[in-house]
């Protein structure tokens, strides 16, 4: 939505539509109490909704709220894995690290109850824009 609130009606319909699938998605919505409630509902219903973040502290907040998190990192990041200040393990997306690995093969972003943050290297046509957003959020080094 344009007001930053996740629609409960849409969330219920989405959960019903994918209930028999291995489905995952990403959300950039703020973690307000209302949005947290809906994101937790969706994850309990079997749709893995990863909280997209641009800083380790934001990823830590999502994990502390009981939600799976992903983290966009600088394209020059050389570490394959590390830990955040809160002790959460971060792993760079396996499909970005190894030839022949696809999302369908890996399924790490779909894994329910995972305690690992999946990091994505900024890439593609929006790489420059992503790098600028990371710098603004304090996530780029």
Task: Name every feature range the model reports, one short phrase each.
Residues 1-141:
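Class I S-adenosyl-L-methionine
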